[in-house]
Amino acid sequence: MKKKTAIFLTALLLLCMVIPAFAEQAVTFPQGTITSEPIELFSEHFHVSIDAGVYVPGDLMERWEGIYRAMETVSGIRFEDGAYARKIEVRCRANETSEEGEFYVPVAYQNQIDLYPADLLANGSYAILHEMSHTLNYFYHEASEDWESRLMAEGFAEYTAYQTAKWLEENDPALAYAVGPSQQILYNVALEDEETLYTEELSHWMKEPYPYSGNPGYSEGLRFMAYLERVYGNDTAWMTALDQATKGKRVEREVSALKASYGEDVLDGFYPWLKENSALFDYGDMDAPVDLRGVQQVTLYPTFNRLENVARLSGRSVRYSDLYVDLSQAMLYLRDYKGKDVSAAQLKVDCLTTVDAFDANGNLLTTIDKEGVIPMDGVAYVRLNGIGTLYGLDLIGWGEFYW
């Protein structure tokens, strides 16, 4: 009897050792689509209209709702509490050059946002953060197309986008990866000659955006919003007061709203504060690693612009811990959306651990030992095993070019 029991237990143990190899389930990722006709998407807070001929990620609305919630958290106010609050209407226009990043301009006005296909990917593009910040602002007062107010309007949008990106890095690193590093925002609003800023009163730069900066109006505006938040506890009180300031031109109304909200000395205190706190806006090492150690899976999307056409996980090194990377959407994007010949496409990897490559059914195709190149034929996704650092994960052999 004891012998039979021992044989049974041995067989059971062997079975348990074998089962996991066959029970491995394929990892599922959001599946994108290329629109063949105009479509509309709806979620709790968004109504999105997308032209035909646009690649749309499968988790687009989920991502935007996540940004919406994060933005309310960092700003301390709710979209829905604004006197002008409505569902956010987003229009995505198809354009042959629309994936050219900085060479086009997304816009927002009241509850309306115009974007382009590259912004839908949210892969290193924080445009949706900036434009959504505009809607949050405009929900609390009557919007204006008067560019004299660029410091206030663009400053609030850029600072709120920065704060949101920072929050995501700490609380939702997968979504943070999608919108790009917060330090990129600081890089874009660097001040080239800060001393010249102090030669004029702030109200002057509200009328004439400061020219010696990465982005006039945005640069000094972001810093002013940081000042309001850190010194007075918020950078939003002026928005509701703006509608009450009905006399004078736009900048005069903004000055009145600021003084009514924060006190008569609010403008005078900015320069002394900025001189003591300018280090807050140092963007730091632009090659610092991307930290994805708390992320289970991400999708690689190609980047197309006038400087480079690439399909890589990141332009920086990446820290990971058992990270799954979807490559199927990149192949769909290249082949069916951009019309590229991917028959000779290869996966090039350079990291500190092994990398397993799987087909769409979860079958292990091959394992790369730290560094190597394999054909993409049949590969749907990979797993970066263990804890390590990735120095490169690229799809090559389809006509890519690098800056």
Enumerate the language-model features and the residues they cover.
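Sec-dependent N-terminal signal peptides of Gram-positive bacterial secreted proteins and lipoproteins
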Residues: K4-F22
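Zn2+-dependent metallopeptidase catalytic core
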Residues: Q25-T28, P38-E44, A52-R91, E96, ...
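Second-shell loop/turn segments in exported
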Residues: S49-L60, Y116-N123, H141-E148, P209-G214
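Zinc-dependent metallopeptidase catalytic helix centered on the HExxH motif
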Residues: V105-A190
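Active-site-proximal alpha-helical
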Residues: L186-L267
